[in-house]
Amino acid sequence: MPKRKAPAEGEAKEEPKRRSARLSAKPAPPKPEPKPKKAAPKKEKAANDKKEDKKAATKGKKGAKGKDETKQEDAKEENHSENGDTKTNEAPAAEASDDKEAKSE
């Protein structure tokens, strides 16, 4: 790369301009003030609230049914063993009572 030539002794070099003359000549335009948003009428909000209340009520009902269904499924799963034989909860209770009778004798 060629080296820069040293300026002559009598000449003063100006600093390079970063902005063009066109941009520096014009001041920045002022930003327009934002307009305030219009407030919605209260009547429309009340109508929307009623609709939301109805939606919430129906959602609650669906959720309760879903919980009941899962409880029933859990109960069914407890009654079935992995190999397909059914287990009864009464059998262990009967064995426990037999053990108590044997101990008392």
UniProtKB/Swiss-Prot annotation:
Binds to the inner side of the nucleosomal DNA thus altering the interaction between the DNA and the histone octamer. May be involved in the process which maintains transcribable genes in a unique chromatin conformation. InterPro entries: HMGN_fam. It is found in: Nucleus. GO terms for cellular component: chromatin; nucleus. Its main location: nucleus. The lineage of its organism: Eukaryota, Metazoa, Chordata, Craniata, Vertebrata. There are two HMG-14 proteins in chicken: HMG-14A the major component, and HMG-14B the minor component. Belongs to the HMGN family. This is Non-histone chromosomal protein HMG-14A. Keywords: DNA-binding, Nucleus. Residues 1-105 are annotated as: Disordered. Residues 1-18, 32-56, 65-88 have a biased composition (Basic and acidic residues). Disulfide bonds: none annotated. GO terms for biological process: chromatin organization. GO terms for molecular function: chromatin binding; nucleosomal DNA binding. The keyword Nucleus applies.
